[in-house]
Amino acid sequence: MNVRLHNTLTGQKEPFEPAEPDHARVYVCGPTVYDYAHLGHARCYVVYDVLVRHLRADGLKVTYVRNVTDVDDKILKRAAETGTEPTVLAARFADAYSEDMHRLGNLDPDVEPRVSTHLEDIFALVQRLVDGDHAYVSDGDVYFSVESFSDYGKLSHRDLGQMKLGASERLDETKAARKRHPADFALWKKSEEDAWGWDSPWGRGRPGWHIECSAMSMKHLGDTLDLHGGGLDLVFPHHENEIAQSEAATGKPFARCWMHNGFVEVDKEKMSKSLGNFFTARDLFDRVEPEAIRYCMMTVHYRAPLNLDWTLDDAGNVTGFPQFEEAERRVAYLYKTKQRLEGLPPKRVVDVDGPVPPDIAGFAEALRESLDDDLNMPVALAKLADFLKAVNELCDQAMRKKGKAARRAVEQAQAGFRALEAELGIGTESADIILLRIRDRRAKARGLDSAAIERQISDRTEARKSKDFAEADRVRDELAAQGVELLDGPEGTGWTIAD
């Protein structure tokens, strides 16, 4: 295995070397389930899904843990706004999140722990920190003492002496007064008797956000993780605080490698509800194929920002997303190529000597090498484009008059598609089904009725049978004017929407 990844802790691209050479323990911070998954979530979990797929394709056993934060102040706030019980709201959005991840083609993690089922583990870790003088109780809250951990700031490269109070604490002098140092953070938060919370050794309350991930990750993966991942926004304070409390408790390195993906931006601004440029994955599912969203997330390096453009009508309504639409065209091309390969007549595939086209023969290896190099998905997609071009040329050769395709080349092309599915998680669906969905969605977007188009094609077929070629041409031209391209073949007439 020759995987090299950028380690946020060192700022260097390094060989990925799990503690056990054949087993990688991977933890990724999951969502706080108070709303639907947004495009930032989509990007994050596609990135780590590709990572896990690639490590497994390289022969590693991977234990992949991705949590669900179903206890958090944001959930409590949203529940109050909507008049919903917090546990009910969290469960609903957790289920929706899982559905969205499946639609994006992400594999289930091996373990998906929830905070609500790990409270005893959280209690034990907090008590361990209190007993070790790394945490203290203050009026029912429990805080981690950052001054007790000499390496605080090593991930984010921040100096403790320069850290200031957060905005919420500048407004809450009572909370600030409970702390020994302004940067101390809550491990346990006191709550009123009638508020959402749990009984603990320190009174009724709720766990702090940071301690949740430490407790869950160490419960399922041990004291030292091989890789901890998440979005760039989690470097500080979340991951910095995870390191502090975990290493203070165990005396061991918390993670061997830290990996962070970049933001999703719209018109070069970070997505924000206040700016009106905030989109959930579900906002896009009706506009483009979910696999196109997955593909689009791979078009820039995972550490760089993914900047999306949008188109608006005169009233300011969103009418399109050019990058996702282009990604859908590329996904359609992929499936059309796969469909052509699968549909080659057996009599056209023969045993002949000769070299296999290099972009077919070398595709699986080129794909692996691209992902070995800090998960370089844009390069992997460039290799895919070369592969698809070569496969189409192979199919063209086979379908010429008296044309043939070498069986070895066809088999290696089929192996290339299997590698694509295993490594990138694209090309996994039935070509017939996904192309039909894309076609019908494009027709609907143009205000066209698929059933009406089918009727017109049927009328044209009858006209051709009756040798009324003028009528057949009229129907063809009428459909062409609407952007409908007819595909005449030995098994009848199909259709597609022209780009």
PLM regions and their residue ranges:
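Structural preference for alpha-helix termini/caps and helix-kink/transition segments
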Residues: 270, 277-499
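Short, glycine/charge-rich beta-strand/loop segments that flank catalytic centers
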Residues: 68-73, 94-97, 107-122, 140-149
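Alpha-helical recognition segments enriched in aromatics with Gly/Pro capping
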Residues: 1-34, 49, 99, 120-342
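Short phosphate-binding/catalytic loops that engage adenosine nucleotides
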Residues: 60, 134, 484
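N-terminal, positively charged nucleic-acid-binding surface of large information/translation enzymes
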Residues: 10-15, 19-107, 491, 495
